[in-house]
Amino acid sequence: MLRGVLGKTFRLVGYTIQYGCIAHCAFEYVGGVVMCSGPSMEPTIQNSDIVFAENLSRHFYGIQRGDIVIAKSPSDPKSNICKRVIGLEGDKILTTSPSDFFKSHSYVPMGHVWLEGDNLQNSTDSRCYGPIPYGLIRGRIFFKIWPLSDFGFLRASPNGHRFSDD
């Protein structure tokens, strides 16, 4: 009797650990559903929109300029940020101050990316904290799930490109 109960208990614990490991690998390496909060990505992503983020791109260095990514915040590692990739390592970026009076250039160092929100007037991004390490990127967002009226692939940046050629 006791042997049967212990056997069932160990099987249950084993299955729980096994499924927990499978779920962890799925969310860590494949992707998952994310709710974006804040106005920094408007109009592309509104506050409380639900999107799908895939994580394979970050593992295989498939992040490109124009991609929207989820990353660990450089100023608060407990929170995530949702921003668009403006520059990759080695790029020269045209940066502006919030008032748009002063324009300058910044270089993205090796192993880093330059992230900005689509809503430039209401976004804390690389213009404030500089380029972020590639290792902080958690995944690439490419599909909006909710609201259903916006269901589908995400559109290009409303700000156009701001790369410097000189």
Curated annotation (Swiss-Prot):
Location within or outside the cell: Mitochondrion inner membrane
Active-site residues, Swiss-Prot/TrEMBL: S40, K83
One annotated Gene Ontology cellular component of this protein: mitochondrion
EC number assigned by the record: 3.4.21.-
An example Gene Ontology molecular-function term: serine-type endopeptidase activity
Entry's family note: Belongs to the peptidase S26 family. IMP1 subfamily.
The protein, known as: Mitochondrial inner membrane protease subunit 1
Species of origin: Homo sapiens
